[in-house]
């Protein structure tokens, strides 16, 4: 049988990569209407990420650059670059249920959390482990999380994300699992901000995705924001 460490490592291997390039759609279900925002993302490890919004027209050309714990956003409307840091990285992106960190961070759980197995459960005819993860370091967006991990896919099909106090901040789930470059990976993530009473959730739908792609360092230069 797999040890807790084996499970976490397998999950990290599926979800993380040295780098990735992806196009994605964010579908934000508001109270009255639904918005769809398309973007292209370049991510290297945990420290470098660049996002460019492609549509709708109002958001097109907006860009985000993340270097470590710092984030810069560029808005073509104002032609200004603004720096965001610290707790602001936990704020909502474009009114969605996702934060900058949810979208742009690629950090292995193994490094960040101590895990313990709470049991097993069958969901929709598939076996899952239930695992509790507690932060090893301060300052994480989600100091505690509980994950339901599919025993075949080795992916957290459902997660509850908690504050240090134990308050439920968000729920996340994934579906549309398929093999991408030899790994199981979801086609869709669903995030729900549990602190927003009226939230109907945000879908993050993967388009084309390339893992371990070569991304030139110049992609992460601040000058790119205005180009």
Where are these regions (language model features)?
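Solvent-exposed coil/turn segments that connect beta secondary-structure elements
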Residues: 27, 44-46, 54-56, 69-70, ...
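A short, sequence-level motif marking secondary-structure junctions
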Residues: 41-45, 67-68, 86-90, 175-178, ...
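Gly/Pro-enriched, hydrophobic low-complexity segments
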Residues: 80-84, 101-104, 124-222
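N-terminal mature ectodomain segment of secretory-pathway/periplasmic proteins
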Residues: 3-77
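Short structured motifs
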Residues: 6-9, 36-37, 113-119, 172-175, ...
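Long, terminal "pre-/pro-" and other extracytoplasmic accessory regions
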Residues: 30, 59, 109-126
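Acidic/charged, solvent-exposed loop-and-adjacent secondary-structure segments enriched in E/D, K/R, S/T
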Residues: 75-105
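A short, amphipathic edge element
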Residues: 4, 34, 104-116, 166-171
């Amino acid at each position: 049988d797999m040890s807790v460490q084996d499970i976490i490592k397998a999950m990290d291997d599926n979800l993380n990569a040295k780098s990735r390039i992806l196009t994605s759609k964010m579908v934000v279900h508001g109270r009255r209407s639904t918005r769809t925002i398309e973007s292209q993302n370049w991510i290297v490890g945990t420290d470098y990420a660049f996002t460019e919004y492609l549509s709708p027209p109002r958001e097109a050309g907006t860009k985000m650059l993340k270097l470590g714990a710092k984030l810069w956003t560029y808005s073509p409307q104002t032609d200004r670059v603004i720096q965001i840091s610290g707790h602001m990285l936990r704020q909502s992106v474009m009114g969605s249920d996702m934060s900058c960190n949810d979208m742009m961070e690629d950090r292995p759980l193994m490094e960040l959390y101590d895990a313990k197995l709470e049991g097993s459960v069958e969901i929709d005819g598939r076996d899952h482990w239930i695992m509790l993860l507690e932060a090893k370091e301060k300052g994480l967006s989600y100091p505690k999380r509980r994950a339901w991990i599919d025993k075949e896919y080795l992916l957290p099909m459902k997660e509850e994300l908690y504050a240090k106090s134990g308050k439920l901040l968000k729920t996340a789930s994934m579906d549309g699992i398929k093999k991408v470059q030899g790994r199981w990976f979801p086609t869709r993530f669903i995030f729900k901000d549990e602190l927003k009473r009226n939230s109907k959730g945000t879908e993050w739908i993967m388009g084309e995705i390339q893992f371990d792609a070569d991304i030139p360092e110049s992609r992460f230069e601040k000058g790119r924001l205005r180009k």
